[in-house]
């Protein structure tokens, strides 16, 4: 796996790539999303098996992310032409069908290298997921091995949690969901949470 330049708490590596957006080719840059959160997820290859389940799941929940001021972008090392062919293939035949999220083409593998998810022996990306805040700062990184897909619910929960901490200055305990108790991050005030939950 490439080491990459992606670091928590630092500006996310910038990128520019051709994407398939609403069935057409469009140049997409990270800076296009300034002021919004971004969930950037990498997947190994088009026309495979776990990948369409993840892409369709993220596409089906795209509006939930947008309500939070967050956009979801998928990336693989395939070309925009392969992405389009896969989108134009019916879901019952292993295709994607129409999508509500862009798919970026990383044919040079630069994005995969910059984000540290390139599986160098095969030239494909591991299942990396990156949450970038509205200031362009990388807030979360997870990388799965190839055979296991990711949870859209968990990605959505993490965006909600980071946005909550940004706005309120409190911290979110394990398994936090909107409406749950948070912790005031100092020794005395944190006892309020711990006395209630232990």
Swiss-Prot record:
One of its GO terms (molecular function) is thioredoxin peroxidase activity. It holds the Pfam family AhpC-TSA. GO terms for biological process: cell redox homeostasis; cellular response to oxidative stress; defense response to tumor cell; extrinsic apoptotic signaling pathway; hydrogen peroxide catabolic process; leukocyte activation; negative regulation of apoptotic process; negative regulation of extrinsic apoptotic signaling pathway in absence of ligand. One of its GO terms (cellular component) is cytoplasm. The modification N-acetylalanine is found at residue 2. It catalyses: a hydroperoxide + [thioredoxin]-dithiol = an alcohol + [thioredoxin]-disulfide + H2O. It comes from the Eukaryota. It is found in: Cytoplasm. Thiol-specific peroxidase that catalyzes the reduction of hydrogen peroxide and organic hydroperoxides to water and alcohols, respectively. Plays a role in cell protection against oxidative stress by detoxifying peroxides and as sensor of hydrogen peroxide-mediated signaling events. Might participate in the signaling cascades of growth factors and tumor necrosis factor-alpha by regulating the intracellular concentrations of H(2)O(2). Belongs to the peroxiredoxin family. AhpC/Prx1 subfamily. The active site is a conserved redox-active cysteine residue, the peroxidatic cysteine (C(P)), which makes the nucleophilic attack on the peroxide substrate. The peroxide oxidizes the C(P)-SH to cysteine sulfenic acid (C(P)-SOH), which then reacts with another cysteine residue, the resolving cysteine (C(R)), to form a disulfide bridge. The disulfide is subsequently reduced by an appropriate electron donor to complete the catalytic cycle. In this typical 2-Cys peroxiredoxin, C(R) is provided by the other dimeric subunit to form an intersubunit disulfide. Homodimer; disulfide-linked, upon oxidation. 5 homodimers assemble to form a ring-like decamer. Interacts with TIPIN. This is Peroxiredoxin-2. It comes from Homo sapiens (Human).
């Amino acid at each position: 796996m490439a080491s990459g330049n992606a670091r928590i708490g630092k500006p996310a590596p910038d990128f520019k790539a051709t994407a398939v957006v609403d069935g057409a080719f469009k140049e997409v840059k990270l800076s296009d999303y300034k002021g919004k959160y971004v969930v950037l997820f990498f997947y190994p290859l088009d026309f495979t098996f776990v990948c369409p389940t993840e892409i369709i799941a993220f596409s089906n929940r795209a509006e939930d992310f947008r309500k939070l001021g967050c956009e979801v972008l998928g990336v693989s090392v395939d070309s925009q032409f392969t992405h389009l062919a896969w989108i134009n293939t019916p879901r019952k035949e292993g295709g994607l069908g129409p999508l509500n999220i862009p798919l970026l083409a990383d044919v040079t593998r630069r994005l995969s290298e910059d984000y540290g998810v390139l599986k160098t022996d095969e030239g494909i990306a591991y299942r990396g997921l990156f949450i970038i805040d509205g200031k362009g700062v990388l807030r979360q990184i997870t990388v799965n091995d190839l055979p296991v897909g990711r949870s859209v619910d968990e990605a959505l929960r993490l965006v909600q949690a980071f946005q909550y901490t940004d706005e309120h200055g409190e911290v979110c305990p394990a398994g936090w969901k909107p409406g749950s108790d948070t912790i005031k991050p100092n020794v005395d005030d944190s006892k309020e949470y711990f006395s209630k939950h232990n």
